[in-house]
Amino acid sequence: MIRRPPAVVCYICGREYGTKSISIHEPQCLKKWHNENNLLPKELRRPVPKKPEVRTITAKGFYDLDALNEAAWTSAHSQLVPCNVCGRTFLPDRLIVHQRSCKPKAAK
């Protein structure tokens, strides 16, 4: 059985990155998030995502990777906004695109 290298979930976008590259990715992802958030209409703008705090579990200062990833995934998904027509959730910039084609269900 082949073991995958440990991956860390980005708390901003929810994607997985290697333990070495996450520290490079997060500042770039946050900058992109700010740029995209500033382009949204005021009513769709979101508060800045906060990096989840997970306590170290060993004397050497290691983190519980599963707990860290769970907290990051929850943080990333808390930014989703529901469509006021169908209720599906989207990132705010994708909600605008979705709403162009979302139609209320016809009454039976």
Swiss-Prot record:
This is Zinc finger protein 475. It holds the Pfam family zf-C2HC_2. PROSITE patterns: ZF_C2HC_C3H (PS52027). Its cofactor is Zn(2+). A zinc finger (C2HC/C3H-type) spans 6-35, 79-108. It comes from the Eukaryota. PANTHER family: C2H2 ZINC FINGER CGI-62-RELATED, ZINC FINGER PROTEIN 474. The keyword Glycosyltransferase does not apply. Zn(2+) 1 binds at C10, C13, H25, C29. Zn(2+) 2 binds at C83, C86, H98, C102. Keywords: Metal-binding, Repeat, Zinc, Zinc-finger. InterPro entries: ZC2HC1A/B-like (IPR026319), Znf_C2HC_C3H (IPR049899).
